[in-house]
Amino acid sequence: MQFFSLKTRIVLGEGSLSYIKSVAKKHSRVLIFSSKSMRVHGFLNETMNYVEDANAEVEAITGVPAEPSYEYVESIMPKVREFQPDLIVALGGGSVIDVAKAVKVFYDAPELKFEEVAFISRFEKPKPIPKLKTPLIAIPSTSGAGSEVSAASVLKKGDIKYNLVSFEIAPEFAILDPRLPRTMPKEVARNSGLDVLVHGIEAYTTTAATPFSDAMAIKAIKLVYKWLPLSVQGDEKARENVHYAATMAGIAFLNARLGLCHSLSHKAAWIAPHGLLNAIFLPYVMEFNMRSEYARKRYAEIARELGFNTAQELIEVIREFNEMLGVPKLSELVSEEEFLSKLDEMSEKAYHDPLINFNPVEPSIEEIKELYKRAFYD
């Protein structure tokens, strides 16, 4: 028996940010989490004006860190509780949305302890998150994470990245206004777009994929393959298409999950941005997965959708795509000494990553170590 679910209502199109006024009319106290860039580009002000037009009180917390942590969430909880919002809005990239999701958990269920509900290993079983009442609107400004529809939040505590996973934290609404991703710098557009491509390919090849998640994954892959090079150059239509592809891929992995490539990049997060690491590791993970007949079949299906024939061709196409977009080698991002000093720790942690459970081939710690080394020395 399989399931396909989507909790989030999606609103899209030029100027769709104004929809927030319709939602805010049903609420009295609206708390907005915003990235600095959304404040600078005027979108925070626009959002606050829509809320005020709906006769709701509004408060904003800006400057959410790029690497969200539980310590940061803990530091802002007194302000959140003092304001007592009945609607939470996340305006920014995946980090902002992840913070808003975590705030929703500990605001609605203050009795919960972080360590009870967050987890780092597939061999742990966290306490389920109870029913939460405060609705969340996600308004992504970058086109990659898929956090606007996903049921997960990734937060650091100390140096360790934890996962919060529950349908309770999936946003009630996602507003996809293509004006927002037009503000992305080229490098952010590239890295986040590459993340979408990996989301699509991994969601299509997990052991939990369904015909419904497949449809979203394939459409996202095709859109990114066609439009990302133009998006990096700032083309407005391309930015819009990649923005929608990010959410489609998010719907795909919400249901089908992800795989080994993400496990590797999560534990190497100290080296470079997440999307860039995913792009670097992807061809090596695909080669590793080729021992599975199921994975070979699925890669070949993706290849045919892009106008090629075989799984092996797809791997070469991915390498060429990376090269065209200027994706560096892993060895250009970190010194050999530093890489080797953390290799054992990264490999051990990646082996425990929950997403390994959905990869078409289960790797050993030694095989994970070899994949890291191949990516570095190739």
From Swiss-Prot:
One of its GO terms (molecular function) is butanol dehydrogenase (NAD+) activity. Keywords: Iron, Manganese, Metal-binding, NAD, Oxidoreductase. It catalyses: a primary alcohol + NAD(+) = an aldehyde + NADH + H(+); butan-1-ol + NAD(+) = butanal + NADH + H(+); hexan-1-ol + NAD(+) = hexanal + NADH + H(+); ethanol + NAD(+) = acetaldehyde + NADH + H(+). Changing H199A: Disrupts the overall structure of the enzyme. Retains 10% of ethanol oxidation and acetaldehyde reduction activities. Optimum pH is 8.5 for oxidation and 7.0 for reduction. Dependent on a divalent cation for ethanol oxidation, among which Mn(2+) is optimal. Compared with the oxidation reaction, displays about 30% acetaldehyde reduction in the absence of divalent cation. Shows maximal reduction activity in the presence of Fe(2+). Its EC number is 1.1.1.1. Optimum temperature is 75 degrees Celsius for both ethanol oxidation and acetaldehyde reduction. It comes from the Archaea. Fe cation binds at D195, H199, H262, H274. InterPro entries: ADH_Fe/GldA, ADH_Fe_C, Alcohol_dehydrogenase_Fe, NADPH_BDH. Thermostable type III alcohol dehydrogenase. For oxidation activity, the best substrates are 1-butanol and 1-hexanol, followed by ethanol. Shows lower activity with ethylene glycol, isopentanol, isopropanol and glycerol. Displays higher reduction activity in the presence of butanal, followed by acetaldehyde. Has lower activity with hexanal and acetone. Belongs to the iron-containing alcohol dehydrogenase family. This is Alcohol dehydrogenase. The lineage of its organism: Archaea, Methanobacteriati, Methanobacteriota, Thermococci, Thermococcales.
